[in-house]
């Protein structure tokens, strides 16, 4: 079990039944906001995929995927998704979406190697979204514009929740602060990446840390990223300061996706050249898929943040270590 944060004197502001009502309101409101702001159309999404397609998310490349075999397909092995990062781009190409339009899904995933704590669960639920762009829009400026659109939707959600549930009032900044991972390392060279995130997010309350995945001048990465969906020069994480837990709290990871050149370069840098033979990777390398931008926005993360919950298990049902359940109960945190 990872380190558990137990806020002193914690008491949930909403009881379980009211929490469930609030969760529905948050999800209904935000998905409409984000669909309108980014011009997205809702689509159904897979729970599992064929590993031979290369469509599953490899995350940091070391996490084991949940898999099983299908009796009626000669025991063919399939994998439960870890995210839909690559699947969404494939769908945009398959259905010939035009620049400026895209999709969002309710993504449900299982990550069996997740280290469980207040904000990490084996079960992951998020709005996974993807939008077609032009080659000319593969710029930092376009990335920032998209981050601002998402942040405005989050700000509108904050105002909505404050009206609906004043007992869990949240005040977030009018604007999000942008900084690159290298600028952050230059500011705090003696600190580890997570410590840097803590300081910058505590100061600015809402931050987009960009350019994640490649090596910094120190020779270390800010954080790991799979080499086959985000362009490491055009991606980042949206972080909010969570004052219930006293931590930098990630609500979204997103980026402009790799073109053929970035895919080629990053596969080699990551030592993943074996993926070049997978269907998805061949399509990107051969310029057969549209340019796109996309990401994931945590559903339970947003609910947890705006309802001022101390544990993600207060807003979704999962399996937790017995000692975690017991310790949470003793400190006023009731896991569903």
Task: Name the predicted role of every residue range.
Residues 2-120, 128-132:
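Class II aminoacyl-tRNA synthetase-like tRNA-binding/catalytic domains
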Residues 105-191:
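Extended, charged alpha-beta segments that form solvent-exposed binding/catalytic grooves
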Residues 34-41, 150-161, 310:
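A generic secondary-structure signal for well-formed alpha-helical elements
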Residues 68-71, 93-99, 119-121, 169, ...:
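A general structural signal for short secondary-structure junctions and capping/turn motifs
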Residues 110, 180-336:
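A translation/RNA-centric and nucleic-acid-associated enzymatic feature enriched
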Residues 50-57, 168-179, 321:
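N-terminal pre-domains immediately preceding structured catalytic cores
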Residues 18-25, 29, 138-145, 279, ...:
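Generic recognition of stable, solvent-exposed alpha-helical segments in well-folded globular domains
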Residues 101-103, 124-128, 204-206, 246-248:
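Extracellular structured ligand-interaction cores
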């Amino acid at each position: 079990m990872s380190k558990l944060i137990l806020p002193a004197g914690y008491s949930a502001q909403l009881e379980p039944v009211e929490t469930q009502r609030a969760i529905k309101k948050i999800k209904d409101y935000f998905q409409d906001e984000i669909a309108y702001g980014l011009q997205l159309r809702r689509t159904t999404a897979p729970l599992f995929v064929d590993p031979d397609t290369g469509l599953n998310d490899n995350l940091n490349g070391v996490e084991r995927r949940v898999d099983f075999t299908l009796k009626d397909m000669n025991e063919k092995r399939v994998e439960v998704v870890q995210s839909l990062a690559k699947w969404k781009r494939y769908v945009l190409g398959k259905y010939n979406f035009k620049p400026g339009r895209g999709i969002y899904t309710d993504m449900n995933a299982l990550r069996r190697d997740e280290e469980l704590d207040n904000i990490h669960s084996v079960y992951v639920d998020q709005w996974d979204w993807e939008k077609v762009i032009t080659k000319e829009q593969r710029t930092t400026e376009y990335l920032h514009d998209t981050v601002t659109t998402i942040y405005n939707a989050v700000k509108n959600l904050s105002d909505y929740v404050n009206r609906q549930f004043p007992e869990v009032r949240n005040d977030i900044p009018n604007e999000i602060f942008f900084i690159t991972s290298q600028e952050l390392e230059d500011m705090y060279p003696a600190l580890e990446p997570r410590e840097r995130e803590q300081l910058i997010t505590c100061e600015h309350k809402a931050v987009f840390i960009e350019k994640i995945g490649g090596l910094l001048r120190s020779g270390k990465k800010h954080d790991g990223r799979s080499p086959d969906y985000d362009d490491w020069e055009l991606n980042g994480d949206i972080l909010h300061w969570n004052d219930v837990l006293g931590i930098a709290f990630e609500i979204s990871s997103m980026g402009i996706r790799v073109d053929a050149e970035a895919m080629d370069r990053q596969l080699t840098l990551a030592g993943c050249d074996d993926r070049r033979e997978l269907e998805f990777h061949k399509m990107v390398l051969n310029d057969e898929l549209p340019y796109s931008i996309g990401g994931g926005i945590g559903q339970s993360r947003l609910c947890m943040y705006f309802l001022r919950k101390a544990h993600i298990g207060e807003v979704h049902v999962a399996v937790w270590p017995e000692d975690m359940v017991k310790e949470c109960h003793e400190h006023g945190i009731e896991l569903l």
